[in-house]
Each structure stands twice: as C-alpha cells, then as structure tokens.
Amino acid sequence: MGRKKIALIGAGNIGGTLALLAAQKELGDVVLFDVVEGVPQGKALDLSQVGPIAGFDAKISGSNDYADIAGADVIIVTAGVARKPGMSRDDLLGINLKVMKAVGEGIKANAPDAFVICITNPLDAMVWALREFSGLPHSKVVGMAGVLDSARFSHFIADEFDVSVKDVNTFVLGGHGDTMVPVVRYSTVNGIPVPDLVKMGLSSQDKIDAIVKRTRGGGGEIVALLGTGSAFYAPAASGIAMAEAYLGDQKRILPCAAYVDGQYGVDGLYVGVPVMIGAGGVEKIVEIELDDADKAGLQVSVDAVKELLEACKKLDPSLA
C-alpha cells in the first residue's frame, strides 16, 4: 500500500509548518498548494532538504495547479488573508469567502473523497462555506478551532497551577472568536476538576476568570505582539492532531467546528463541539450536559456564527 497523501491549500506560515510536521510524523507525502507562483515550490524544496537531517522519507512538492491535489486523503485549508492588528476575524469575511469558493471548487473537482480540515478565519463561517462550495459530506469537512483554543486554555492552566501540560485537559465550546466558551468545570488537572482545585486554595476564581478571558483573546494577543501576521505554530500542530486522528482511526474526542444538526439545541451550522474523529471523519458529536451559564454562553456564540452566515449569504447569493 502506498503512502497517504496530504494536500495543504495555502503555503503561508501555517501551511509551511503543517508540511514540516506532517513530514516529520511521516503522515504521508505532502503537496503544498498556493496561487502564488514559486512560493509553494520554493518552500517544498526547502522542506524536502530537512529530510536528510530529520530522517524522514516523505515527499514534499509544491504546486499552483489544483489537479495536483487529486486523490488526497487529507486536505488542510489555510488559504486566505491573515489577521492584522486591530482587525477582527469577521473583518476577513468578504476576502476569504471568495478564497473558499475557489478552494471548494478545486476540492470538488479533484479530491471529493478527502477529509477536509479548515483553518481559515473567520473559522465557523469559512468551514460552512467551504462545505457548501465543495459539496462534500458534512462528516468529511471540519474546522480547526477548539483544539487550538483548548491548547491555549491548557497552557494557561498549567502555568497557573505550575503542573505539566500533560496532566491538563481543558475544554472549549462555541465559535472560534471572542464568544468562545471555555468550560471550566469540564477542565481538569490529572482528573481533578479545576473548580475543586480552586476550593482547595490552589488558585482563585478571579485568576481562573482571567485565564478564561485570556483564552478568548488568545489569538488577538499574539497578533498584537507580532505586529504583522498571526499565530501559526500552534494552529498547525492542532490541524495535524486532527489529521492524525483521521488517518490513524484514533477515535479521539476533540473539540472541533463540526456540523451540528439538533445537538445542543443547534440546527444546521458549524460550531465548536466535542466530536469523535476516526476513519469515517466526524463519527459522532458528543453531547455533554451544560449548566445554565455555559448554555447561555454557547447560545451567544451560536448567534454570532448565525450572523456571519447571513453576511456570507448576502455576499454570495449562491449560498442562500
């Protein structure tokens, strides 16, 4: 059996990092696609020359032709404009919607059997639009949001309690933006819920509330510090974790922007929920019990996503 094929749409910072991680983990051969001539080819050549040093045999190629993604097992989409300081994810809507149309049509024509992971912002709207334009089953198109947001939450929690990140499990629901819902009571340190650790006097509610707020603004904090560009190492690592779950049929429970149809009282849109990812793609949506505060927070997030979808439909009537 031949190697798996990973197609990366967008050869920017996230795309390049995805290519390196996929090759290092030997997930398969990598095709790095971009509309800018020379960029994917140059990055692919540079990355290929890491192989003799890092010891991987994965082939990495660059292309400007969607035909070269044909037969891809996994496609990770990062194409589009990145956030700039002062720009919200939603400001990106008009520009990146057009990009998703081109990408969706390219996937539909060349790799209709792939498992597609969208990273382009504003995430919850872009993954929905990409699914609409590509026509793929909802179970085979998912957005990378909660894995990254939970990683940020976990990092801050590990710092607060001065413990290994390996012992921290956190959980973020809702849209990938300021309305996300970090669920503190389902977040644990080696199985001990964070609220219990607060009761033990190991932290304070004020500090945990500040961590929740910082998690919500995690992407913006990095954008402001960088001055130009946005986060790319952790987003790429998050996308690779999702790809590994699919390729290895790992049945991992990961928070992702998945198509929700009745669960959590939500109908017909993509929003961050815990899902099982295996060889069938999104195999199950895990519906956990939420308290009133988390339910209210999720509803605010859902309403924000709905507004974005309505804006998408106005910008491109074919989506209506």
Swiss-Prot record:
It holds the Pfam family Ldh_1_N. One of its GO terms (molecular function) is L-lactate dehydrogenase activity. One of its GO terms (biological process) is lactate metabolic process. NAD(+) binds at residues 10-15, 34, 96, 119-121. The keyword Electron transport does not apply. Keywords: NAD, Oxidoreductase, Tricarboxylic acid cycle. The keyword Disulfide bond does not apply. The active site is at 176 (proton acceptor). Its EC number is 1.1.1.37. It catalyses: (S)-malate + NAD(+) = oxaloacetate + NADH + H(+). Substrate binds at residues 83, 89, 121, 152. Coiled coil: none annotated. Belongs to the LDH/MDH superfamily. MDH type 3 family. PANTHER family: L-2-HYDROXYCARBOXYLATE DEHYDROGENASE (NAD(P)(+)), L-LACTATE DEHYDROGENASE. Catalyzes the reversible oxidation of malate to oxaloacetate. HAMAP family: Malate_dehydrog_3. This is Malate dehydrogenase. It comes from Sphingopyxis alaskensis (strain DSM 13593 / LMG 18877 / RB2256) (Sphingomonas alaskensis).
